[in-house]
């Protein structure tokens, strides 16, 4: 999967993965993580998610990473924020209040870039990536952020019934990808097929969302 794939998705507004409301799993489970109010939270592959504002509204400093400059600019425009723009290594950084969006390749992110981040929120990052890239993503994420707490949201369905993205990432893969460095605990599992017409149309017969708590070992 090449960067152009995502650039075209954003340019053509094919962004069915974007949620028009704050994610309910985030609202339900984040408070139980006991993450300090002023903690810095890393949000990989963040798009223009409203979850960024929700996290900032709880007092957190939010560092989102997004490949598409259109997504980043749309976020600030739609939220009526005027960001300051600067360069940081390979990234173009947009800052407004407690939100920083780093526009560039997630795999270029370094440990120094995320210094101070003690929390992680992944709703649509790992499931956006095909298998080989998921391996790279998990390894890179754990190398730059070995000690953290946070939430991961995944989808699980029969991948043979529909091509991704979003891709299916089952519980065994979550444990294999992340369990060697972090403690990974499933908090919730929901059957969401009835709410997902795209999947039904494609012939998917089972669709589950899972929410995991992540803690550095």
From Swiss-Prot:
Enzyme class, broadest EC rank: transferase
GO cellular component: cytoplasm
GO molecular function, one term: thiopurine S-methyltransferase activity
Subcellular compartments: Cytoplasm
Residues reported to bind S-adenosyl-L-methionine: 10, 45, 66, 123
Catalytic activity: S-adenosyl-L-methionine + a thiopurine = S-adenosyl-L-homocysteine + a thiopurine S-methylether
PROSITE patterns linked: SAM_MT_TPMT
Gene Ontology terms: biological process: methylation; response to metal ion
UniProt entry keywords in alphabetical sequence: Cytoplasm, Methyltransferase, S-adenosyl-L-methionine, Transferase
Chief location of this protein within or outside the cell: cytoplasm
Keyword S-adenosyl-L-methionine among UniProt keywords: yes
Enzyme Commission number(s) from the entry: 2.1.1.67
Keyword Signal: no
PANTHER family: THIOPURINE S-METHYLTRANSFERASE
The family this protein is said to belong to: Belongs to the class I-like SAM-binding methyltransferase superfamily. TPMT family.
Name assigned to this protein: Thiopurine S-methyltransferase
The gene coding this protein: tpm
């Amino acid at each position: 999967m090449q960067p152009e794939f995502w650039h075209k998705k954003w340019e053509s507004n094919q962004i069915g993965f974007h949620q028009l409301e704050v994610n309910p799993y985030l609202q339900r489970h984040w408070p139980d993580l006991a993450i300090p109010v002023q903690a810095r939270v890393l949000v990989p592959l963040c798009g223009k998610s409203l979850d960024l504002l929700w996290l900032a509204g709880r007092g957190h400093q939010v560092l989102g990473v997004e490949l598409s400059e259109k997504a980043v600019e749309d976020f600030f425009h739609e939220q009526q924020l005027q960001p300051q723009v600067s360069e940081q290594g390979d990234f173009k950084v947009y800052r407004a209040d407690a939100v920083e969006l780093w526009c560039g390749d997630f795999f270029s992110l370094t440990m120094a870039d995320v210094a101070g981040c003690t929390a992680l929120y992944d709703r649509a990052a790992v499931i956006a990536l095909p298998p080989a890239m998921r391996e790279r993503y998990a390894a890179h994420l754990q190398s730059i952020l070995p000690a953290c707490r946070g939430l991961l949201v995944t989808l699980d369905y029969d991948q043979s019934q529909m091509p991704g993205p979003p891709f299916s990432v089952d519980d065994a893969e979550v444990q294999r990808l992340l369990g060697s460095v972090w403690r990974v605990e499933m908090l919730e599992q929901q059957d969401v097929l009835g709410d997902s017409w795209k999947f039904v149309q494609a012939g998917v017969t089972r669709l589950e969302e899972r929410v995991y708590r992540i803690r550095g070992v």
